């Protein structure tokens, strides 16, 4: 939607519609020129690109960081769950929910910079099997929130940081 129509029109009409060929994505999608990018829930690449017809491009986008421990495939997608922001053209910021790490990529998926901090922590995830169920839980000793709500405005990039331990009594995601 155009912003003016979205705000003022009681029945806005979409200017473009995309139907993705695959749907295993964790957070919102971003624009990179005429393509879409989404954070994946897969262990091979943290993101994938889709063309304007919604077809997934053959190669994944970006790379997962090396963590403090060797993760299983299930643990890596949980430990590095993320949300992204783009400048709409050629830059992507992947902001991690459970480690204070932001990965900056160019429009081709090449890592430009890894920003650690302000506290340099990793939440550790541990895979479990319970009958037919397989999952991954955060280790409570390390379970912390990191980055939320990234926004790209012009040449600037903004993101909220929490840093609190999730299992503390007065924990609040908002404060």
Predicted regions mapped to residue ranges:
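Entry beta-strands of beta-propeller and related beta-repeat scaffolds
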Residues: 35-37, 90-92, 155-159
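Solenoidal tandem-repeat scaffolds enriched in leucines and small polar residues
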Residues: 30, 36-64, 68, 77-79, ...
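Short glycine/acidic-enriched loop and turn motifs that connect beta-strands
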Residues: 42-46, 99-101, 164-167
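Beta-propeller blade signature
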Residues: 2-3, 47-52, 170-175
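Structural signature of eukaryotic scaffold interfaces centered on beta-propeller domains
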Residues: 26-32, 76-89, 95, 141-153
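Long, acidic/polar, low-complexity amphipathic helices and coiled-coil-like
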Residues: 1-41
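Loop/turn-rich, solvent-exposed surfaces of beta-rich toroidal or solenoidal domains
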Residues: 135-175
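Surface-exposed loop and turn segments in beta-propeller and other repeat-based domains
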Residues: 6-22, 57-77, 110-142
